[in-house]
């Protein structure tokens, strides 16, 4: 019961693949209403609808009244990610954790999602933690970077320092591989145990 109490756990998470996080047999409206029923049970039905419509507008979903009646498969990948962001923010978290929030999105949609996260962070005063292997995402949105391997923090510094003067050999090897990949295409590397936040 405590897991659903925002006073106990004031954070929310956006998972990597919104299609697997959303029930394909339920409408988007059902998903959003369920979040409010669990996290803000004192709201009336009318107050829930107003909060949902406002949040959908805030995350850039046009025609929210119509969209509430649609199913996840009727949305593009970028729009599903916006729905996940709306669901996460309806819990009124202090911290938002986004696990690879731009995976499988084209470059234009990636930029839109990152800009949205940055804008919401500033508007709502959120702490946003981005878990990513993508150095362009890290460079574009992060202030601080934690380089992790096997669950251990190997290096922590401001983003500019990580890119210009990283100290740990593992960080340096990740950056070197990313530069090589950017210039020559994908480089085979075992990155399953590495995380950049």
Residue ranges and their predicted role:
Residues 4, 62-65, 158-197:
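Charged, flexible cofactor/metal-binding loops and thiol motifs
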Residues 138-140:
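A short, surface-exposed alpha-helical micro-motif characterized by mixed small hydrophobic
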Residues 32, 85, 96, 109, ...:
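Hydrophobic anchor residue at the start of the ABC signature
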Residues 153-157:
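ABC ATPase "signature
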Residues 111-124:
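Helical segment within the ABC ATPase nucleotide-binding domain
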């Amino acid at each position: 019961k405590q897991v659903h109490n925002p006073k106990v756990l004031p954070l929310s998470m956006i998972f990597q693949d919104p299609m697997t996080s959303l029930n394909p047999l339920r409408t988007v409206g059902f998903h959003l209403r369920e979040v409010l029923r669990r996290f803000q049970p004192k709201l009336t039905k009318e107050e829930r609808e107003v909060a949902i419509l406002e949040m959908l507008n805030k995350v850039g979903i046009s025609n929210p009244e119509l969209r509430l009646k649609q199913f996840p498969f009727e949305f593009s990948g970028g729009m599903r990610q916006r729905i996940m962001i709306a669901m996460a923010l309806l819990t009124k978290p202090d911290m938002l954790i986004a696990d690879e929030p731009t995976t499988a999105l084209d470059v234009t949609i990636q930029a839109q999602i990152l800009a949205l996260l940055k804008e919401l962070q500033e508007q709502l005063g959120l702490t946003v933690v981005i878990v990513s292997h993508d150095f362009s995402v890290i460079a574009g949105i992060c202030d601080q970077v934690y380089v992790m391997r096997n669950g251990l923090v190997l290096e922590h510094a401001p983003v500019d320092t990580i890119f210009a003067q990283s100290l740990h050999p593992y960080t340096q090897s990740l950056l070197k591989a990313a530069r090589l990949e950017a210039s020559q295409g994908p480089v085979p590397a075992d990155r399953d145990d590495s995380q950049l936040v």
